[in-house]
Amino acid sequence: MALSDADVQKQIKHMMAFIEQEANEKAEEIDAKAEEEFNIEKGRLVQTQRLKIMEYYEKKEKQIEQQKKIQMSNLMNQARLKVLRARDDLITDLLNEAKQRLSKVVKDTTRYQVLLDGLVLQGLYQLLEPRMIVRCRKQDFPLVKAAVQKAIPMYKIATKKDVDVQIDQEAYLPEEIAGGVEIYNGDRKIKVSNTLESRLDLIAQQMMPEVRGALFGANANRKFLD
């Protein structure tokens, strides 16, 4: 039975409607999938950028923290150096004051004579040479001569050795030093410095740990004394 034109048109419309509906559904499916993929990619990009930003600021924060530590360490070192310099300056001032007071000892002739007696005899014992030369300030010559005369017999008794001790009258010690003597062996290759300044420096060096402790307290980090 042949279809009429109306039936043909109806079937064609039905087929076109079906095709159109299927096309729309396919388009919607494609759009939905594209939107889903877009959202996934967008989320991935956002997360990647967020991680990069977090990593950047974490790195910056660590750098700033490290810079703070370095600056703090530098400030602490500078402060420590200032304290050490201040301590050294104070100790130097104390030593300079002590050196200035040596002149008072020299002005007391009786006290100075006793001191010279000890310095000369000590120098002889340190050298233990058969011939020794004593140098002193020109103004101290009489006192040093008396000290040498006292020291020779004491030296001979103690060492059971003879000794020749001369006072150098050609090259005196500088007048600006506080006093004391220098003692040489016969060829002047060995010297014992027993000037008042050298003795004070030696005593100061030996007592430096005690001086620091008295002035600034004990150092908890110091295992050995100077």
From Swiss-Prot:
Tree of life domain: Eukaryota
Subunit structure: V-ATPase is a heteromultimeric enzyme made up of two complexes: the ATP-hydrolytic V1 complex and the proton translocation V0 complex. The V1 complex consists of three catalytic AB heterodimers that form a heterohexamer, three peripheral stalks each consisting of EG heterodimers, one central rotor including subunits D and F, and the regulatory subunits C and H. The proton translocation complex V0 consists of the proton transport subunit a, a ring of proteolipid subunits c9c'', rotary subunit d, subunits e and f, and the accessory subunits ATP6AP1/Ac45 and ATP6AP2/PRR.
GO cellular component labels: apical plasma membrane; clathrin-coated vesicle membrane; cytoplasm; cytosol; endosome; microvillus; mitochondrion; synaptic vesicle membrane
Reported function: Subunit of the V1 complex of vacuolar(H+)-ATPase (V-ATPase), a multisubunit enzyme composed of a peripheral complex (V1) that hydrolyzes ATP and a membrane integral complex (V0) that translocates protons. V-ATPase is responsible for acidifying and maintaining the pH of intracellular compartments and in some cell types, is targeted to the plasma membrane, where it is responsible for acidifying the extracellular environment.
Biological processes annotated in GO: proton transmembrane transport; synaptic vesicle lumen acidification
A Pfam family: vATP-synt_E
Keywords from the UniProt entry: Acetylation, Cell membrane, Cytoplasmic vesicle, Hydrogen ion transport, Ion transport, Membrane, Phosphoprotein, Synapse, Transport
Stated family: Belongs to the V-ATPase E subunit family.
Protein name (record): V-type proton ATPase subunit E 1
InterPro entries: ATPase_E_C, ATPase_V1_Esu
PANTHER family cross-referenced by the UniProt entry: ATPASE H+-TRANSPORTING V1 SUBUNIT E1A-RELATED (PTHR45715)
Phosphotyrosine: residues bearing it: Y56
Membrane topology classification: Peripheral membrane protein
